[in-house]
Curated annotation (Swiss-Prot):
Taxonomic placement: Bacteria, Pseudomonadati, Pseudomonadota, Gammaproteobacteria, Alteromonadales
Matching SUPFAM superfamilies: YajQ-like
NCBIfam families named in the record: PRK05412.1 (NF003819)
GO molecular function: nucleotide binding
Keywords (A to Z) from UniProt: Nucleotide-binding
Sections of the chain in a coiled coil: none
One GO term describing the cellular component: cytosol
Species of provenance: Shewanella sp. (strain MR-4)
Protein's name in the database: Nucleotide-binding protein Shewmr4_3156
Length: 161
């Protein structure tokens, strides 16, 4: 029986490239000349540091535009609400969503069941496996999940026939 997995993951190479491009843009921007600002990436967390809270927000915008240029969905970003003030600098932590949380996975399973498409879906850790008899049914589920607005992008992999 044909099946596929619904996953939500960020390509780490593209993420690293976007951070490097953001650093380059930061060094060439006129409004950051002479300012103490930096962008650092470590363990799926990007730390944005600047002298002012407003500049931290600008760094988030720079990172968001570079992510979209590298085809990394900006909706995977989880930005801290308030910047942390330590000494003379402000810092923001940006985390990236990896995997599908259980409540979102349950929403996907419920959405697939409510659609009356003849497939079975089950939660397997941070992925959702969808199995059906016809390939067309699986493609209909893919279209359904793409159209749903669940707050994070999904990829489909491990397609077996």
């Amino acid at each position: 029986m044909p099946s596929f997995d619904i996953v939500s993951e960020v390509d780490e190479v593209e993420l690293r490239n976007a951070v490097e491009n953001s650093r380059r843009e930061l060094s060439s921007r006129f409004d950051f000349r002479g300012k103490d600002a930096s962008i650092e990436y470590k363990d799926h967390v990007v730390t944005l540091t600047a002298e002012d809270d407003f500049q931290c927000k600008q760094l988030v915008d720079i990172l968001r535009t570079q992510l979209s240029k590298r085809n990394v969905e900006p909706s995977t970003m989880d930005v801290d609400e308030k910047s942390v003030h330590s000494g003379k600098t402000f810092s923001l932590k940006v985390r990236f969503k990896q995997g599908i949380e259980t409540d979102i996975a349950k929403k996907i399973v419920k959405m697939v069941k409510d659609s009356k498409i003849k497939v079975q879906s089950q939660i397997q850790g941070d992925t959702v496996r969808v199995t059906g008899k016809a390939r067309d049914d699986l493609q209909a589920v893919m279209a359904l999940v793409r159209q749903a607005d669940l707050g994070q992008p999904f990829q489909f992999n491990n397609f077996r026939d």
